[in-house]
Amino acid sequence: MKPTYCGYAAIIGRPNVGKSTLLNQLLGQKISITSRKPQTTRYQILGVKTFKDIQVIYVDTPGLHAGTERTINRYMNRTARGALRDVDAIVFVIEPHWESQDAWVLDNLKEIETPVFLVINKVDKIKNRAELLPLIEKVSSLYAFQKIIPLSAKTGDQVGTLEQAVHQLMPESPFYFPPEQVTDRSDQFMASEIIREKLMRLLGQEIPYSLAVTLIEFRKEEKIIRISAVIWVEKKSQKGIVIGKGGERLKRVGTNARLDMEKWFGKKVFLQLWVKVKSGWADNERLLRELGFEE
């Protein structure tokens, strides 16, 4: 019987470097929400890619970041660090410049023996690739990376190079997931994340970090899925901002989310949204656990 190869690859980096976009590109479909705002990803998400006799389970993590005053930030850092345990490869994503936050992430890797690929993302924004040479020289002196790969997660340029490099590190093993499965997350989780993505894309800089989404109904019928969700905010003033004048903003969120859900589930979706205030939820460990954050 022909052997199969299967293993885990963690995607890490500071917030907003394009980790989730890279995961979606690797999988050939969207399973991790994206926005231009940092810290869009809050939960660890597995993306499964099976190609012939190789299965790679990519682990998309929240962005590692210094400054952990809020309880929710400490939870996200623990989640990201926890993803580094027992993986077969690490994909460390940066932008085409080196920042102090990148150095802080690298410090978290220096005691880990797992091979690390350095991905320089967003190279589609650079006119001349020769501009990357000083950066490549600098990072090469900081750590013995398995390979340094400039790519564009947005366009897909050189993503195949990364994929082939990761394949070479996968150990011989039976597949952990059926070949057709693309994520470990439930339909309910995907629905709540789609709603949160639309909120983050429509709202200002601060409010998205005070938002959470929980489902109170998820019912599959023959021709339609009925979903009811609560959007939690921390302050009464934020509730008005989320709803918008005459309910216009909440209506846009609902429409955009419903259209994405219908693509994901392959059937019609009836979606209802409510906005409620839960003061201090992002600093309350009990409430964070209720919302799906893990120790």
Swiss-Prot record:
Q: Which residues bind GTP?
A: 13-20, 60-64, 121-124
Keyword list (alphabetical) reads:
Cell inner membrane, Cell membrane, Cytoplasm, GTP-binding, Membrane, Nucleotide-binding, Ribosome biogenesis, RNA-binding, rRNA-binding
Sequence segments annotated as region (G2): 39-43
Q: How does it sit in the membrane?
A: Peripheral membrane protein
Identify the main location.
cytoplasm
Give the region (G5) as residue ranges: 151-153
Q: Does the keyword Cell inner membrane apply?
A: yes
* CDD domains listed in its UniProt record: Era (cd04163), KH-II_Era (cd22534)
Q: Which residues form the Era-type G domain?
A: 5-172
- Which parts of the sequence are annotated with region: G4? 121-124
Q: Give the record's GO CC terms.
A: cytosol; plasma membrane
Which Gene Ontology biological process is one annotated for this entry?
ribosomal small subunit assembly
Q: Name one Pfam family in it.
A: MMR_HSR1
SUPFAM superfamilies registered for this protein in UniProt: P-loop containing nucleoside triphosphate hydrolases (SSF52540), Prokaryotic type KH domain (KH-domain type II) (SSF54814)
Output the Gene3D superfamilies linked to this UniProt entry: 3.30.300.20, P-loop containing nucleotide triphosphate hydrolases (3.40.50.300)
The protein's GO terms of the molecular function aspect are: GTP binding; GTPase activity; ribosomal small subunit binding; small ribosomal subunit rRNA binding
What InterPro entries does the record tag this protein with? G_ERA_dom, GTP-bd, GTPase_Era-like, KH_dom-like_a/b, KH_dom_type_2, KH_sf_prok-type, P-loop_NTPase, Small_GTP-bd
Q: Where in the cell is it found?
A: Cytoplasm; Cell inner membrane
Entries under PROSITE patterns matching the protein: G_ERA, KH_TYPE_2
G1: region residues: 13-20
Oligomer and partners = Monomer.
In UniProt terms, what function does this protein have? An essential GTPase that binds both GDP and GTP, with rapid nucleotide exchange. Plays a role in 16S rRNA processing and 30S ribosomal subunit biogenesis and possibly also in cell cycle regulation and energy metabolism.
Family the UniProt entry places it in: Belongs to the TRAFAC class TrmE-Era-EngA-EngB-Septin-like GTPase superfamily. Era GTPase family.
Protein name (database record): GTPase Era
> What is the native source organism of this protein?
Coxiella burnetii (strain Dugway 5J108-111)
Which taxonomic lineage is given here? Bacteria, Pseudomonadati, Pseudomonadota, Gammaproteobacteria, Legionellales
